[in-house]
Amino acid sequence: MASLFSDFGFIWYWKELNKIEFMYFKELLIHEILQMGLKQISWTEVKEASREDLAILLVKHCDGNQAWDTTFRVFQMIGRNVITNRATGEIAAHSTIYRAHLKEKLTHDCSRKFNISIQNFFQDEYDHLENLLVPNGTENNPKMVVLQGVAGIGKTILLKNLMIVWSEGLVFQNKFSYIFYFCCHDVKQLQTASLADLISREWPSPSAPMEEILSQPEKLLFIIDSLEGMEWNVTQQDSQLCYNCMEKQPVNVLLSSLLRKKILPESSLLISTSCETFKDLKDWIEYTNVRTITGFKENNINMCFHSLFQDRNIAQEAFSLIRENEQLFTVCQAPVVCYMVATCLKNEIESGKDPVSICRRTTSLYTTHILNLFIPHNAQNPSNNSEDLLDNLCFLAVEGMWTDISVFNEEALRRNGIMDSDIPTLLDIGILEQSRESENSYIFLHPSVQEFCAAMFYLLHSEMDHSCQGVYFIETFLFTFLNKIKKQWVFLGCFFFGLLHETEQEKLEAFFGYHLSKELRRQLFLWLELLLDTLHPDVKKINTMKFFYCLFEMEEEVFVQSAMNCREQIDVVVKGYSDFIVAAYCLSHGSALTDFSISAQNVLNEELGQRGKLLILWHQICSVFLRNKDIKTLRIEDTIFNEPVFKIFYSYLKNSSCILKTLVAYNVSFLCDKRLFLELIQSYNLEELYLRGTFLSHSDVEMLCDILNQAECNIRILDLANCSLCEHSWDYLSDVLRQNKSLRYLNISYNNLKDEGLKALCRALTLPNSALHSLSLEACQLTGACCKDLASTFTRYKCLRRINLAKNSLGFSGLFVLCKAMKDQTCTLYELKLRMADFDSDSQEFLLSEMERNKILSIENGV
């Protein structure tokens, strides 16, 4: 901070004082600091200080705001109001000039994307961000607010419109004198820069008044957009960061320094990023608030359509087409895509074509819209130049997808066949737009448009046709997409599958004037068959919902059925209504499953407006039990069941021919009676039952133990970890240990077993008819008092082989008892698992010595 203010600010005005005035200023400054109760500065230091040294002293002893307030008051005391008035006026004048420039530039940018005003669409977000960034009451700490959301959802559009309304004085009144916007995709092209350099790039004239801009850092808001576009070193030490606004650094180091409050810590920050990147960085930055951006709401989408269509009835008809198609409605939550979709439908309707057909799938609408962009107005077919231009654009797009580039310079365009003379055309039709940071750099209208063009490349060409060695062949492309290796690839694989549909193939053939290879679909199936084989080492890495969305976009019944029948194991995680539609469609085409996992989270309870439709889809999903008769393993995870939802599930499973061997219900909540669920357990010849994280009441445990005590029960593995078992549960489980002849593994970790509960279990374990081999008691609130009872099972019970006691407070006394029992010649235990961090230093030393003599001990070193 000291070096910061020595470069600008105070010095700028002190230079107007002569030697006598400057000394008088120093005397009054010392007095004013004393009067204000600020941190004192030695008069000797002040007296001898130059203007630069005094700036350093001031900043060292006061924060930026206090230093400026004090300085301005002293200027007034010595009768130099002219200086303070001019400084205030110049600050206001520069800010006014900057606001006008920003408004003009951003309004122009938005008008190229939208022919309608969308500024008012975000009013709720403006209000919310103002509440987050403007301190309440006397609070004066700078804020760091994070906006997270999926790529392309509209975070950048929101931020740019926020800057427009700020430039008009509608938000942050008197809070921020300047707002500066840095996009990571853009600025990463600079090898090195200082913060002053980045600010100067935003200024309307070549010379920015840097001293004045940085003189009040608490009145600065820095917007850092698209953190996912930059490489961040989260292990970087403070000593490797930058502390001076004028110091040139690699851009990622510079922005890291800003994010970590090493430069201008008094300033506020507004950051946008993808959810995945925020998850990686959230422990690295000290943010004050997080807001998830979900894009346009239904009323915003409706407003967009009605703003574009002159006829209200046609507007409503077009909107209804989108509202009835959940996938198109979902992509319309991204403002740019919403406008693109509405424009496409408008053009189709005005051309006398049926808009329904292009709403078949998302790919269908994108194909129609993007091909139409390259067909001249009133023409039936594209020109040869248009064909070449779109083809070259596909080369550019796929290179960017593989090299993680979304901002392209003119060299990249020329390398892919796009000449300087082509650029105005691409800008005019709206498929490219100029980068905000550089007049000679360009981006696609939306990330999904780049993905679509990249997918089209693989329909038109082989990777061998591309000069970039980083563009890989189609198998690697699809493997990368299905395994989510590149998180920014959202639609790429889906568009590729969608373009294989016969209708889309016909559109491409009509546009480019030649037939596409029919071999591609057959080759794709052979590759999927290989990848989806249960013996393939990467089969479990495939993201099921990505795979499902690809098949859904393709909508080829025979192909989808064949692809689904390649999979014996499927793990479905549905997070919304759209996921339910896609999952129901795909699951209705398969009959080869042996292992099925479903996570519905709380969607079936939250989506109130779609409750009826969701239940229909839930019927379709649950019918998987009727079509797949060989399901042996069923997993339900992170799901909330209400009564109608569970009854549907119960009915299909009960009436199926499945012979379940393994049933998993991890973290499942029942908003209904669990009696039917427990009946399911009884209905099957189960061998493994996992109920981890699922709440079990006293009566639930009683019913479960009654089932376990039946002679025909074959359950070998029982996992009741973190089930909130109460003190009465241990007597029921003790009976199970006495009577059940099949149970080999019992996990009751993360329950309040305590010493008394364990005593009851130990009494059962010492009986000769107990069959248990392994017992996990991790984090059961056990103390050394239980160890005598537990040690007795080592010698008196001949079946018990493994015990896990990690995360309990056994102490030295308990440890000593256990180790002594393990030395007994009659001990049949194979493994006793403890955790080093649970013991004090003396106990740890004892434990290490015991480990050398006793191989039964297994020690965890983790925390």
UniProtKB/Swiss-Prot annotation:
Pfam families: LRR_6 (PF13516), NACHT (PF05729), NLRC4_HD2 (PF17776), NOD2_WH (PF17779), PYRIN (PF02758)
InterPro entries per UniProt: DAPIN, DEATH-like_dom_sf, Leu-rich_rpt, LRR_dom_sf, NACHT_NTPase, NLRP_HD2, NLRP_innate_immun_reg, NOD1/2_WH
Alphabetic keyword roster: ATP-binding, Inflammatory response, Leucine-rich repeat, Nucleotide-binding, Repeat
Domain (Pyrin) ranges: 1-93
Ranges for the LRR repeats: 618-643, 683-706, 717-740, 741-763, 765-782, 797-824, 843-863
Residues of the NACHT domain: 143-466
Biological process annotations from GO: inflammatory response
Molecular function GO terms recorded: ATP binding
Binding site for ATP: 149-156
Annotated family: Belongs to the NLRP family.
Role: May be involved in inflammation and recognition of cytosolic pathogen-associated molecular patterns (PAMPs) not intercepted by membrane-bound receptors.
Protein name: NACHT, LRR and PYD domains-containing protein 4B
Encoding gene (name): Nlrp4b
